Each structure stands twice: as structure tokens, then as C-alpha cells.
Amino acid sequence: LISGNNTGTGILQNIMDSNGTGIICESEADTVSTAIGTEYGNWSDTLRKAFDHDRLSYNRRTDREYQEVSRSYLSVLLSGTPAQVKPLIPTAENGLFSRQNFYYMPRVTQWADQFGEDEVDVDEEFRLMGNEWKNTLDELTLRGLFTLKLTHAQHKQFNFLFDKLFHRSGKINGDEMSSSVIRLAVNACRMMSIVAILRSLEDPSLVKPDAHISSDNLKDRIIPRWNLVITDDDFHAVLALVEPLYLHATHVLSFLSSSVIKRRSTADKNMLFAEMEDEFIRRLLLEKAHDRRIPESTALT
């Protein structure tokens, strides 16, 4: 667990010390942006490489020590206000923006009762869940490598969805969202892997030994590689997240500076065009915009 109140170099060193793994979890995004200060380059480079599990290296000049990890596994969870996004991701052009998943929370519009009837010890509940997950993770680690295998039909549905989204993003936002769509596909596959592995704990039939495991190893139950499938229900549940995540990303994009295009689309406009056919007339567009309470000028520009 790596502190966000850190420097870019410090974060890199912490990852090295834990053999390439780490989690950063902060409730205030400016804790990180203030701490890294002038070392933004180190922070950005580390996050971009960690997204693809790339090699990380570090050269300590004081004692001429060189450190390296061949694979990196870093998870980052931050919350904050729109104003706290820009210091962390000043622009969409260096690749850091497209590597993130965003969720823009709606404003609280009414008071909610702050008093509960139960007497649940929340800290204890989280400890129990943490211990349960650790035991599960230890068991999965001992079993070896799991590889997610999609069916041919799932391949077609996945490609159909992202092909349409990629085409639409190019028409509405130019090249700014192209990388985000591509990496959203990567993140969707990662979410499918997690959902599938959790489902396999309930239904062991979703996991089969890899076809290249020798018969002798199968007899001795020495199986280091497993093929994992995802149910159609779980597959479609994850795919249903793609469009909302794309819209949240386009909304956050509007907070960032741009030197590429003068006018960006909004999430509302993206959603409007997502509901239109590939070809449509002006009247139908304005009718749909009226239904969504989107100004005519917004729909037409």
C-alpha cells in the first residue's frame, strides 16, 4: 500500500521495493498532485508504463544503484473534484488520460438521513472482507496462471460494440478520444477477467486445464495453466459498462486543456448521437434533442 503523499521518485521506489506491485488509494486527489509537485514527469511515466505492466527501472545517483522490475502491477484509486483533475492530468495528449477510468458523481440535491438503525461495525466488516479476499487470492495464486477465453460469438459482439464507439468518437471528438476507446477495450477485458474468476469460485466448470498440459501432469494434478470462460450474462453485464464509462470520460475531458481542437463534444451530445441511426435527417435529431432537453444549438454544433 503506497502513500499518495509521496514524490514521483518515491512512488517508483516503493513499487521497486515490493517487486513491482502496489496500490495507491487516496480520498483527495490533490494529496497526490501537491506531493509530486515538480516531479510530475516521473509520476506520469510510471502510471503510463504500469498500465501495460511494462518494465520499470530506477537509477539512484547518490550511490549509483540501479534497480529494475520486469513487470509492474499498480492500481490507483483517487477521488476528488473536477478542479483536482487538471493538476494530475493537465492534458489528454500525453496518454495518461486515456489510461484511466472515470466516474463523475452527480451532485447531491437533497438531504439524506445521516442516522442508521443498525449497529454494524464498519471497520470490522471491512477487515472480514479483506481477510476473506486475501484467502481467496492466495488460493488462486497457488493454482497458477488463468487465461480468459472468449467465444467466437463474444468476439463478434465485443468488436461490433467497440467498432461503433471508435467510429462515433472520431466523428464527434476527433482523435482525442480514440486512445481512450482503445484502452477502454483493454480495461473491459480486465474487468471480464475479474468477474469470470470470481464466478468460477461459484461454478468450477468455468475453468478448464490448458489444452497443452501433458497427460502425466493432468494425472498428477500438476496444472500450472488454466483456461477461463465468462458466462454470457456476465459478459453482457461488463459490456453494458462501456458506454457509461465512455460518456464519463468525455465529460472529464471537457475540464482539460486542448491544443488540438477548438470545440469539444459534451457527454450529453455523445449520448444523443449514440441513440441516432448512422444516417438521419435534421428534424429527427432535433426531436431527439428536445426529448433529452438538449438545446438546439448544442445538438447542431
Give the label of every model feature segment:
Residues L1-T301:
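Phosphate-handling catalytic cores of nucleic-acid transaction enzymes
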